[in-house]
Amino acid sequence: MQVSYKWLKELVPNLRATSAELEQKMSTSGIEVEGVTSPMEGLSKLVVGEILSSEDIPDTHLHITQVNVGAEESLQIVCGAPNVRVGMKVIVALVGARIADNYKIKKGKIRGVESLGMLCALDEIGIDEKINPMKHEDGIFEMPADAKVGDSIFSYLDMDDEIIELSITPNRADALSMHGAAWEVGAIYGLPVQLEKKDLVEASESAASKIAVKVETDKVPTYKIRLIEGVKIAKSPQWLQNRLMNAGVKPINNVVDVTNYVLMAFGQPLHSFDFSKFGSDEILVRQAKAGEKMTTLDHVERELDDSDIVVTANGLPVALGGVMGGADSEITDETTSVALEAALFDGTSIRKTSQKFALRSEASSRFEKGINEGTVREALDFAAAMIVELAGGKVLSGVVESNDYQPILPKVSITLSRVNSALGTDLSLETVEKIFVQLGFGVEVEGEKFTCEIPSRRWDIHIEADLVEEVARIYGYDNLPSTLPSSQNAGELTQMQKFRRTVRTGLESSGLNEVIGYSLVTPEKATEFVGQLETTTLMMPMTEDRQTLRANMIPGLLDIVNYNQNRKNADVAIYEIGNIFLPNPDDIRPIEVPNLAFAISGNVVDKSYNGQAVPVDFYYAKGIVENLLEAYKEVEFIPSNNQAAMHPGRTAVIKINGRVAGFVGQIHPATAKKYDIAETYVAGLDMQVMLEELPAQTIFTDIPKVQAVHRDIALLIDAEVTHAQIVSVIKSSRIKTLSQVELFDIYQGKNLPAGKKSMAYSLTFQPVENTMTDEEITAAVNKITKNLVEKLDIEIR
């Protein structure tokens, strides 16, 4: 936001602080000032001149001019501009002058003719092309007729102004206007604000007799139109052009410039239509139809869908609501009747449309961040009066509108003790009340309780904490005392904090590196690996990519895998421990659940001269989980073919003591392609379940004093039977001495029946006191094989 210091002083007449002092004060009061610049910076010796005579140089486009610059003698200056004429007031760069790009003007000869200066166009004195009302080929700039010859040009073009560049955060969009900035400065210094006023005179003829307004979407709370007839389109007066250029806006014509001026002053976007081009006496505001097309002011045809808001006349779109007008109804030099629009458009809808079409405008950015809902009518009336003032014509009586929307002003209460407790201060009742009055709040004091009625221009204030922040800002952050927090309790880690440290150690011992991802992601990524789920979305996100609280952490890890692999780091092993956010049926605030997730990709062992590379696979990822869950009594890996975004044949749901705790597996190839990454394996675990199911203590057992016994069994089974099923049946045989079951061979193919596979297991029996006899070993193995045959229809080979 570019704030003109001259304009600001008009709105806060008693302001005595310099721009440098203002920069420091605003920065320490909550609104960052990026810097203060002046349009005249780096320029010198630029004066008003008047062309006394002009003579063409034969066979060229050049002219020999004699220019009065207020000196005893006129200056001879050679100029090639096509619009040079006698009597014209111009910008003269004298010999020795500095113009744009630090170029120094020297005495010279052009086509053998001596030239003692330069007649300048606006771009030649540093006016950026984006805000320059003239094209370079149009020629030199003509100064106002009342400009005094010999005077410096800077005051006539307001180039002696100082521009304060504000960096406005989304929560302080109220400062995206001159009025908002004035209220802020007035509050900081305790000065009254004097906003601009204009008296609107209406004609006797009613606007409602010529036009009607209808709104068929709930995304437009109010839509207002004023009709102005008999206008004459022309250039705006120089003061208005100057003010717009200093605000970073390009002057167009008197009508369009008024709408832009009001946008900068009030923060209220307006749009002006050529009413004669409507071909209808009704404006209909609705959602666009899929496939509907319109050509916007930038003369680009755009195909719309039902998420876009359109303003239509005669059944056709004449504006992309809140974003840009249509080319078919734009103001031209022939326009005589103007339909002036002021409305409230849904910010989320505007943001989506703006991003979809890459149309970022001053209007759309303000609708996205929020505008003062209480001054829509005031801004419309001000603009109508100003158009008549500059372009003539008459304002038809009455505002034609969809409904007379008025915002409800919230009331927020706080006590003096709460303010002082939060800030560590000892402020008096009078001091805090004065601060609220300076902010323009309506204040009622009852005992030590303040009840503040918040004006519509401060839509960011809703709760007690907001009032505390306002007091801190205006009182001055630098004036707050430095205090240390006091506590009666000794510090101690919680059970979850201790558990996180244990888990972190386990993951890092498996070769994984910790990363920290964003809690805010896109709505799509928030639920990508967990299916359909209600999510929590910010009302005013900083960016579209950071608007929804994540319901899982894996998309963030995949983004990091992509980042590394794009930089030739193919082997990635990372994990994150953090919170995910799940819907809370009893509260608008989500439930925070501690989770861990990891992602691995590439090789476990790289290829070398004496061995092949060993890539990561499902079993490697599963092994990391098994190591992590080694202390748990019962851990199951159940095959899953319907886990969102995961490979249906290489994914397992993880259960701890019968409770679902997470999943592990390969991401679906389509998901990997979307993230532009190689084959990647991931896991996600609920740390709350892990902590709750963690054994209370580890029971010590003596090291066995007798030798373990090993027996191998080979099984012919259906191909669909899993290793987990087999291990579960073996353990269900309840052989007390069975200490380990290990799969050491799998075969499927030649010499085996179709649909069958062979799996070989090593069984380890560990007696505690006495060595097992052959009969005991045989009985144990037979019990296991019998159980396998009965429950899984297995053939013992």
From Swiss-Prot:
FDX-ACB domain boundaries: 704-797
Superkingdom in the source lineage: Bacteria
B5 domain location: 407-482
Binding locations of Mg(2+): 460, 466, 469-470
PROSITE patterns: B5 (PS51483), FDX_ACB (PS51447), TRBD (PS50886)
GO biological process: phenylalanyl-tRNA aminoacylation
A molecular function (GO) term: phenylalanine-tRNA ligase activity
Cofactor(s) required, per the database record: Mg(2+)
Keyword Cell inner membrane appears in the UniProt entry: no
CDD domains documented for this protein: PheRS_beta_core, tRNA_bind_bactPheRS
Entry keywords, A to Z: Aminoacyl-tRNA synthetase, ATP-binding, Cytoplasm, Ligase, Magnesium, Metal-binding, Nucleotide-binding, Protein biosynthesis, RNA-binding, tRNA-binding
GO CC list: phenylalanine-tRNA ligase complex
Keyword Protein biosynthesis: yes
Cofactor binding note: Binds 2 magnesium ions per tetramer.
Localisation per UniProt entry: Cytoplasm
EC number(s) on file: 6.1.1.20
Gene3D superfamilies: 3.30.56.10, Bira Bifunctional Protein, Domain 2, Ferrodoxin-fold anticodon-binding domain, Nucleic acid-binding proteins, Phenylalanyl-trna Synthetase, Chain B, domain 3
Chain ranges of the tRNA-binding domain: 40-154
Reactions this protein catalyses: tRNA(Phe) + L-phenylalanine + ATP = L-phenylalanyl-tRNA(Phe) + AMP + diphosphate + H(+)
SMART domains noted in UniProt: B3_4, B5, FDX-ACB
PANTHER family assigned: PHENYLALANINE--TRNA LIGASE BETA SUBUNIT, PHENYLALANYL-TRNA SYNTHETASE BETA CHAIN AND LEUCINE-RICH REPEAT-CONTAINING PROTEIN 47
Subunit structure comment from the entry: Tetramer of two alpha and two beta subunits.
Family, as annotated: Belongs to the phenylalanyl-tRNA synthetase beta subunit family. Type 1 subfamily.
HAMAP family attached to this UniProt entry: Phe_tRNA_synth_beta1 (MF_00283)
Name of this chain's protein: Phenylalanine--tRNA ligase beta subunit
Species of provenance: Lactococcus lactis subsp. lactis (strain IL1403)
